[in-house]
Regions:
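Phosphodiester-processing cores and adjacent nucleic acid-binding clamps
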Residues: 1-162
Length: 162
């Protein structure tokens, strides 16, 4: 791999992100080598199913695997008159073995508590409890900060970001 690396993808959905990802794990490491990417993060939606397979296959091609997950998060408490929690995705990336352990705990929390629609989610207390050694990417209009801004809740967005 040359030293002219241009890009490291930090939000890639694989075939394990049902109805969202099309990237086949078998072809990902070769594509990274071909595109001169020294590392890539697989951040499937609400699961870590590919973590081991991805780590082994990427490492075997000299590509640094970055393990992460896009987790649906309940980003605000229910207000009077609301019946469903507001949910938005956050991308969490493990910085270390401890971060990976926390990512697995959060992934388990997803399926221990569902909203009334039966959708998996974590709340802010769980996210705060297991946040050590995790990098959080909240960008995009569909994320919690973008959603709060779109709803005109600027102070809440600033509070959430901090």
């Amino acid at each position: 791999m040359s030293s002219a690396a241009k890009f490291v993808h930090l939000r890639l959905h694989s075939e394990y992100s049902l109805l969202q990802g099309a990237m086949r794990l078998k072809s990902l490491p070769d594509l990274c080598v071909e595109e001169n990417m020294p590392a890539v993060a697989v951040t499937d939606k609400n699961n870590l199913f590919c973590a081991l397979e991805f780590s082994v296959s990427a490492s075997s091609k000299g590509v640094q695997p970055i393990i992460g997950c896009q987790i649906d998060t309940q980003y605000s408490e229910l207000k009077v008159g609301e019946t469903l929690p507001k949910i938005a995705p956050l991308v969490l990336i493990a910085q270390s073995e401890n971060g990976y352990q926390n990512l697995m705990k959060l992934n388990s929390c997803l399926y221990l508590e569902e909203d009334k629609r039966g959708l998996p989610r974590v709340d802010l207390l769980e996210l705060e409890k297991y946040s050590d050694d995790l990098i959080c990417l909240s960008g995009g209009p569909g994320g919690p900060i973008g959603s709060l801004i779109a709803d005109g809740q600027i102070d809440e967005a600033i509070n959430y970001a901090s």
